């Protein structure tokens, strides 16, 4: 959508159909740009559904970005294992038409703010090498690369990367 103002951005939570939208945008984007196969789409849909079925408001976060009622992106914080590795950033996506316009930064900052308020000591996320705009955003917000390894996953050879953000003073 051309010509929108960031002030038009609304962050909401769950609404009917959003699991399908998030899964669809992940599947389409990663198929078209990276050749990911059906196992990626089914994993996103299954794990996102499981997360939302067990969602606990004080432990987990889930935000959907919309502009003029249209889906623009999403992000979640999965706090189920926060005592071990930290709270996990998941299902972070901004639709291609809205990338590079501040929506990703808004979503990521909202998730970091939630983690601070929840008292989490660390936040982490898994991604893969080659997503440079996302990496730039993660590093801009203080995340640091702490692990990487080669893996065959979703029909492709990729280099998985783990980024962490320490929230302790």
Please identify what each model-predicted range represents.
Residues 3, 7-10, 121-169:
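C-terminal "cap" of GNAT-fold acetyltransferases
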Residues 84, 102, 133:
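Residues that form or flank phosphate/diphosphate-binding pockets in enzymes
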Residues 95-101, 129-130:
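Active-site acidic-Proline motif in GNAT/NAT acetyltransferases
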Residues 9-97, 105-110, 114, 118, ...:
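Acetyl-CoA-dependent GNAT
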């Amino acid at each position: 959508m051309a010509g929108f103002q960031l002030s038009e951005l609304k962050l909401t939570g769950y609404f009917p159909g959003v699991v399908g939208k998030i899964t669809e945008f992940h599947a389409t984007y990663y198929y078209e740009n990276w050749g990911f196969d059906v196992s990626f789409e089914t994993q996103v849909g299954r794990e996102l559904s499981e997360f939302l079925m067990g969602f606990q408001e004080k432990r987990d976060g889930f935000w959907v970005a919309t502009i003029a009622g249209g889906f623009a992106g999403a992000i979640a914080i999965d706090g189920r294992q926060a005592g071990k590795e930290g709270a996990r950033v998941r299902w972070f996506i901004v639709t291609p038409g809205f990338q590079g316009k501040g929506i990703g930064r808004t979503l990521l900052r909202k998730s970091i703010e939630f983690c601070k308020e929840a008292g989490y000591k660390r936040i982490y996320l898994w991604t893969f090498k080659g997503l440079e705009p996302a990496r730039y955003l993660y590093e801009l917000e203080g995340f640091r690369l702490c692990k990487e390894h080669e893996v065959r996953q979703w029909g492709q050879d990729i280099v998985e990367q783990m980024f962490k953000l320490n929230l302790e003073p």
